[in-house]
From Swiss-Prot:
GO terms for cellular component: Atg12-Atg5-Atg16 complex; autophagosome membrane; phagophore assembly site membrane. GO terms for biological process: autophagosome assembly; autophagosome maturation; autophagy of mitochondrion; glycophagy; piecemeal microautophagy of the nucleus; protein transport. Its main location: cytoplasm. Keywords: Autophagy, Cytoplasm, Isopeptide bond, Protein transport, Transport, Ubl conjugation pathway. This is Ubiquitin-like protein ATG12.
Amino acid sequence: MAAVAAEQKKVVVHFRSTGNAPQLKQSKFKIGGNEKFLKIIDFLRRQIHQDTVFLYVNSAFSPNPDELIIDLYNNFGIDGQLVVNYASSMAWG
């Protein structure tokens, strides 16, 4: 039953550029909670037209690409959204 709820739940992902990374015209997107973090990585690579991108949740850590977005949101979501910082080069350890 929890898998069904995760499948139907959309998560608002708020992208924030860091350093010299290009800013997005639209910074908030909805994505299915059952998707893996890899989908966010691939999506952002296409949006900013760069092969190398470093992503961090809440400016703190870089999640494993296999993590489910709903799990990240449930544990680290703030104000109804998952904040993902991105950079062209490594920004945080």
